[in-house]
Amino acid sequence: PYTSERAKDKVKELAKIVGRYTEKITLYVVPFTEIQMDIIEKCREDELTIIMRRFMMRVACELSERKKIQSITTGESIGQVASQTMEGLMVSNDVSDRPVFRPLIAMDKEDIMDIARDIDTYETSILPYEDCCTIFVPKHPKTKPRVKDMIIAERKLDIEALVNKAIDEMETFI
């Protein structure tokens, strides 16, 4: 309910464009609102983003397991947003059971925008539709999270049930 159909259409269009450069692309759209609402209700505001990112990694790992995919690739770049610090990436990685590739990791925003223009994703990517990462942004996100603190914070959440329900309710687009 928090992410519009237009936002979903934007992601589908981006996948279609990126698909021109790959053999085959399958888009999995995972409903994240219930996870976010549970995190917001039970965790500290400054930890929302990193706990949400840990859930995204868990969902990606579980989906990878079910689909027999050996690795995860993300679009993260050091320092581009508060959660993409070295500490934030390490805390996110902590829940992954497979390699995580980050081809944009050392690029700055201008480099990434140049690539987006080159592959024709830029104009679509800047469309102003809110997504799950922009709606629930804390005022002061934690930039130096620690694994042990996140493990303690996450004890309040039913991680396995939330991850499984999200994957069970996902939509698949080919």
Regions found by a protein language model. Give the residues of each.
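ATP-dependent adenylation/nucleotidyltransferase module used to activate substrates
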Residues: P1-D118
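Peripheral terminal appendages
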Residues: I25, T85, L89-R98, I119-I174
